């Protein structure tokens, strides 16, 4: 069977809900069917106004309660913003992206 890498990337703007739990379970089941597969967890905390530490903790404890484990230290998306900006600027400089001039 081919090695599979899945990821679950919830946003900590609320508690873990049934839809997110379902997605996490599907990814975990896919990972569990093949010993070489991985499940990575990334916390999408880029909505600074609504993201809260208590919601992140609720998501993590909910996943543990469901018996879902992951294969990495959870990545915190906002910790990577400088790398994202670096890559975006490189794409702009190389002519592979453009800045949106829309008002909204």
What kind of feature is each model-predicted range?
Residues 1-104:
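N-terminal Rossmann-like or analogous alpha/beta NTP/dinucleotide-binding catalytic cores
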């Amino acid at each position: 069977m081919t090695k599979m890498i899945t990821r679950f990337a919830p946003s900590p703007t609320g508690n873990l809900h049934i839809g997110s739990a379902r997605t996490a379970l599907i990814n975990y089941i896919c990972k569990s069917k093949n010993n070489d597969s991985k499940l990575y967890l990334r916390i999408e905390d880029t909505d600074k106004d609504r993201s809260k530490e208590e919601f992140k903790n609720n998501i993590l404890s909910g996943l543990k309660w469901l018996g879902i484990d992951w294969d990495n230290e959870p990545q915190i998306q906002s910790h990577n913003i400088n790398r994202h900006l670096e890559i975006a600027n490189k794409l702009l400089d190389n002519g592979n992206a453009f800045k949106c001039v829309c008002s909204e």
